Design a protein with these regions (language model features):
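HDAC/HDAC-like amidohydrolase catalytic core signature
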Residues: 1-197
């Protein structure tokens, strides 16, 4: 079986998540994917890196303002502001969640946006989040392309994971819904809703 894997996942290495009112070490961390990669290598499966498909396939699933928020977050978070004269160099966890059902107005403030686009306080945004999530999406897309090229079995080892991510919400350790991105990519390439065995 062919495995698609990228070391960029190491860039998402949050220090803590909020669990039951206590900051705890992040459960979802690089060692999880490293263990799987080691097992894949030990089994003798071939491994390739992802190819860059750009942001267009990501934007086919996720809203543009959300993708822009994630791509520019760290630069905005770390610049000097009224909250920090020297800028913030620590992981970001939301402290407020602007209620979307009352007002569909995206906050302009970075702290407001952090809550607006998140569903929990257990998914830290770090300096390397964009690099890791972009690489994870490219991994899924490369796996989809290899299936299109006739490969019989492909394992896209995506980290951070993506199954909890919505069109414009992150949480549950997930930022981009890699499975949805790959599925939409396959649909856009002419595949039916179901692949034949």
């Amino acid at each position: 079986m062919l495995t698609v894997y990228s070391d960029t996942h190491h860039e998402q290495a949050g220090k803590a998540e909020l669990i039951n009112g206590t900051l705890m070490p992040c459960f979802e961390n690089p060692s999880r994917a490293d263990m799987v990669r080691e097992a894949v290598d030990a089994a003798g499966f071939s491994r390739i890196g992802p190819t860059d498909h750009g942001k267009e396939p990501i934007l086919a699933v996720h809203r543009e303002n959300y993708v822009r928020f994630l791509e520019t977050f760290w630069e905005r978070w770390s610049r000097p502001s009224r909250r920090s004269a020297t800028g913030r160099d620590y992981d970001a966890l939301p402290l407020i969640w602007p209620t979307r059902c009352f007002r569909q107005v995206e906050p302009e403030d970075i702290d407001g946006q952090l809550g607006y686009f998140s569903m929990d306080a257990g998914t830290p945004v770090t300096k390397g989040t964009w690099t890791a999530i972009y690489g994870s999406a490219q991994t899924a897309l490369t796996g989809a392309d290899r299936l299109l090229a006739g490969e019989k079995g492909v394992f896209a080892l995506c980290r951070p994971p993506g199954h909890h991510a919505a069109a414009d919400v992150f949480g549950g350790y997930c930022f981009f819904n890699n499975a949805a991105i790959a599925a939409q990519h396959l649909r856009d390439k002419g595949c039916s809703r179901r692949l034949s065995p």
